[in-house]
Curated annotation (Swiss-Prot):
PANTHER family: HYPOXANTHINE/GUANINE PHOSPHORIBOSYLTRANSFERASE (PTHR43864), XANTHINE PHOSPHORIBOSYLTRANSFERASE (PTHR43864:SF1)
Entry similarity comment: Belongs to the purine/pyrimidine phosphoribosyltransferase family. Xpt subfamily.
Official protein name in the record: Xanthine phosphoribosyltransferase
Subunit structure comment from the entry: Homodimer.
Gene name of this polypeptide: xpt
Catalytic activity, reaction form: XMP + diphosphate = xanthine + 5-phospho-alpha-D-ribose 1-diphosphate
Domain of life: Bacteria
Length: 189
């Protein structure tokens, strides 16, 4: 997606050969016009998938997921990283390790929002080692629902997440595939 590539080139900051900072438009400050384009593109890519719900993890996946949900006319559920007084009943949970934050957390979704009738599109801001995606897949399976596919805003193709998801037979659509961050330069696949 050219608009996303341009934004990454102009406003993304390479912190290391493993870490790309995109807080100027995606995961701290949000560019609404770009999020609309991203949502439109996910809706186009998965128009034939029979999606009934979209699932993401708080917080950075919420903006692109909501835009896709708006375009597709389906609800968006975000897996919560923090327990709350209102999220208590027999939760669907999975552990996820964050490469960027270097912490493991438990994410949860209420079973009231997912059922075996659902065909779920996972949307996330990044795909690196695939741990967040695998956690969401686990939660969706616990509900007896089906995974329609995964929509990824930025994929770090040099890490193993995509290969693992491909090997499991999941459809993965990434809007920007980063091949390398070597030398402080973003190289797209």
């Amino acid at each position: 997606m050219e608009a996303l590539h341009k934004k990454i080139r102009e406003e993304g900051i390479v912190l290391s050969d493993q870490v790309l900072k995109v807080d100027a438009f995606l995961n701290h400050q949000i560019d609404p016009a770009l999020m609309k384009e991203i949502g439109d593109e996910f809706a186009r890519l998965f128009a034939d998938a029979g999606v009934t719900k979209i699932v993401t993890i708080e917080a950075s996946g919420i903006a692109p997921a909501v835009m896709a949900g708006l375009n597709m006319g389906v609800p968006v559920i975000f897996a919560r990283k923090h327990q709350s007084l209102t999220l208590t009943e027999n939760l669907l949970t999975a552990s996820v390790y964050s490469f960027t934050k270097q912490v493991e957390s438990t994410v949860a979704i209420s079973p009231r929002h997912l059922s075996s009738d659902d065909n779920v599109l996972i949307i996330d801001d990044f795909l690196a080692n695939g741990k967040a995606s695998q956690a969401l897949i686990s939660i969706i399976k616990q509900a007896g629902a089906t995974v329609a596919g995964l929509g990824i805003v930025i994929e770090k193709s040099f890490q193993g997440g995509r290969a693992e998801l491909d090997a499991q037979g999941y459809r993965v659509e990434s809007l920007a595939r980063v091949e390398s961050l070597a030398g402080g330069v973003v190289t797209f696949k």
